[in-house]
Amino acid sequence: MKKNMKRMMGWIFTAVLICCIGFTIKGVTADAAIVSGGKKNYSYSELQKDLKQLKKKYKNRCQVNVIGKSEDKRNLYEVVIGNPDAKKHLLVMGNLHAREHMTVQLCMKQIEYYLSNYNKKISGKKVSNTLDKVAIHYVPSCNPDGTAISQRGFNAIRNKKLRSALRKMGGSSSRWKANARGVDLNRNWNVAFKTSGRKGSSGYCGPKAESESETRALVKWSNRIQKQGKIVGIVSYHSTGSIIYGKSTSRAPKAVRNATTRMYQTAKSLTGYQLVQHESYALPHGYSRTYYLYKKKIPFITVEVGRGAAPLGGGEFGSIWAKNKNVVIREAQLFQ
């Protein structure tokens, strides 16, 4: 009888334990991550869905704004985390080059990670304290049309005229770097500009500086923020080679050069990515980094993630995430 009673009590205890574990699992599932990790093709529709959920979940910690439209009329989204009225602002741009679309997913994972750890410490500093002093402004996807081409081909472009013109250009759709008009958005900026190349997957600067709606929207975006306060630095994410462009020449003021060096050293300490040593004194034509570093006098680093050629396979995301998850918040900590 006693043995049966003990056996019964053991069953009851096991059943209660299973129920408790079930509730715990339910709790974890309810608080599961919004932004996926490790997918090869993080799409524009996923970006929109995730932004909507992040805004709903963290409505007091972030803002989602539309700063303009692409040539094929997709929204260019800005995500502001922290105090929008802060005196200092850090800008982050992803996906200027279409096939480097894993940077969209990386930016979105960073946004969620910082928001979910808002009241915790990263590298010994409370995230909320940093973001109260330095607001971070992300544009996760600067080139949504080009990304759609890289992921789904020319048929992803909705405008018939644009789609027809694209088919006449050279270049593989999956390896596409440019926007929907065949213009490289990283070479379309109003600094030492001169037209070179031809419309296609890569290398074409455009008929004139800021000819593309995406470039104009980004310039307007940074100008607006500069009127609100000081832009302390810019991080631009690309995805080729696990390197960092972090050098600058005497064309930039000493304070800007020093801040850029500190930004590079911070990123290198976390990622292990090496510095690109060559930095020509002659201004590269129409580059975004050239524009901000030398014309706008803003510290700027370009972080190239990934080992292989873009578009990167989903299997690379885990390593990229481990190295880069703290990069942007640590850059903000430099200036708080």
Residue ranges, per PLM feature:
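C-terminal accessory segments enriched in acidic
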Residues: 3-8, 34-40, 193-336
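Bacterial N-terminal signal peptides
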Residues: 11-24
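Sec-dependent signal peptide cleavage junction
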Residues: 21-34
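A non-catalytic alpha/beta surface segment that caps or lines the substrate-entry region
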Residues: 33-79
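Extracytoplasmic/secreted proteins, especially bacterial periplasmic and envelope-associated proteins
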Residues: 42, 46-53, 102-113, 137, ...
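Short beta-strand-to-loop junctions in surface cap/lid or active-site-entrance loops
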Residues: 78-86, 95
